Amino acid sequence: MSASVKESLQLQLLEMEMLFSMFPNQGEVKLEDVNALTNIKRYLEGTREALPPKIEFVITLQIEEPKVKIDLQVTMPHSYPYVALQLFGRSSELDRHQQLLLNKGLTSYIGTFDPGELCVCAAIQWLQDNSASYFLNRKLVYEPSTQAKPVKNTFLRMWIYSHHIYQQDLRKKILDVGKRLDVTGFCMTGKPGIICVEGFKEHCEEFWHTIRYPNWKHISCKHAESVETEGNGEDLRLFHSFEELLLEAHGDYGLRNDYHMNLGQFLEFLKKHKSEHVFQILFGIESKSSDS
């Protein structure tokens, strides 16, 4: 296993060298962790024992026609290119629906590559060659037309239960994925761990798939609520952003991660966000008003 990971990391460094040669100007390739490549080199040389964090970065692409920018967010799992690359394109000139379509097209294209093939450079080329049509479609959607039919979307809210959520890197991943996909909701850390994610169905399902990868076993979707909408779904949201929820804990033993979150506080939080009905679904016990 370690040999294959090392082989993957060597290929990742090779691809990063190619990217820096393609984008030599400062700021064009922005690493999430500026020490990421150094740590991987040390790991491959044997001077670092622990597996280094994954390479995460953003490349800002200048599209010539129309004159727009696309930020391509890239996460390289340790076993990439032998497992799927995580990519997401974002532009302030695209609405959520067109951004979703753009990323569907990009993901479909990357899915044609065989395991072991490097594909970041190919993804960049695909965006430069194909993104113009998505910006054009956005203009067409907003042109007045008596014949145009409203586009229906599915708004989804998922309630996810985990035995616990403690690790800093996992918590960071959950928040990063939530903000990257432009969903709203929260992540309650501790024991148990609860995640609520809401937004367009495609975004929520991608969030659910991404946070479970590669081996989060003690997690399940306890409840899902969906509704068809012809708008952007903003009026259906119960939350305004995606944030970490930190509550008081019972039996906090310092360095020990064996403590239970204050479910009474959590119930009050749910009431505030018109979600009291979910309490029984998550925990199998009926909610009781704090003033009764």
Curated annotation (Swiss-Prot):
Which Gene3D superfamilies does this entry report, sorted A to Z? Ubiquitin Conjugating Enzyme
Could you list the residue ranges that cross the membrane? none
Give every RWD domain span.
14-134
Record-linked CDD domains:
RWD_RWDD2 (cd23829), RWDD2_C (cd24163)
Superkingdom of the source?
Eukaryota
Q: Which InterPro entries match?
A: Phi-like, Prp3_C, RWD_dom, UBQ-conjugating_enzyme/RWD
| Record PANTHER family | RWD DOMAIN CONTAINING PROTEIN 2 (PTHR15955), RWD DOMAIN-CONTAINING PROTEIN 2A (PTHR15955:SF3)
What protein is this chain from? Answer: RWD domain-containing protein 2A
Write down the species: Homo sapiens
